[in-house]
């Protein structure tokens, strides 16, 4: 089962390849869909508002960021069998803010 705010390794195909992603599909939908919306995670850190910094506390081997400007829909079968980590409460709030910024959602 896949849940929002979990981090999985996924095969995104070319050019992104295999990389970690953070699931952003809501839980009620993620349990029944064959594909979920994810934000890719990258080691390229630009320090912009649409990024969420991550690291070992979230199950990743080094410092990196969730890149909310490049969200993608990924077939569930492209995700590894289990998550490598998940976001804590503070990172979940940061992700929500970064997504609102990236998608220009004002409220």
Where are these regions (language model features)?
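Generic anion/oxyanion-binding catalytic loop in active/binding sites
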Residues: 10, 27, 84
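C-terminal terminal-subdomain/extension
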Residues: 59-107
């Amino acid at each position: 089962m896949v849940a929002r705010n979990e981090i999985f390794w996924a095969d995104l195909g070319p050019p992104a390849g295999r990389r970690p992603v953070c699931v952003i599909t809501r839980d009620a939908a993620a349990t029944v869909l064959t594909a979920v919306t994810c934000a890719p995670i990258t080691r390229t850190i630009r320090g912009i508002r649409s990024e969420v910094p991550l690291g070992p506390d979230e199950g990743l081997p080094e410092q990196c960021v969730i890149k909310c400007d490049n969200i993608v829909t990924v077939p569930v079968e492209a995700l590894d069998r289990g998550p490598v980590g998940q976001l804590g409460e503070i990172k979940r709030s940061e992700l929500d803010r970064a997504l609102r910024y990236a998608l220009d959602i004002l409220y």
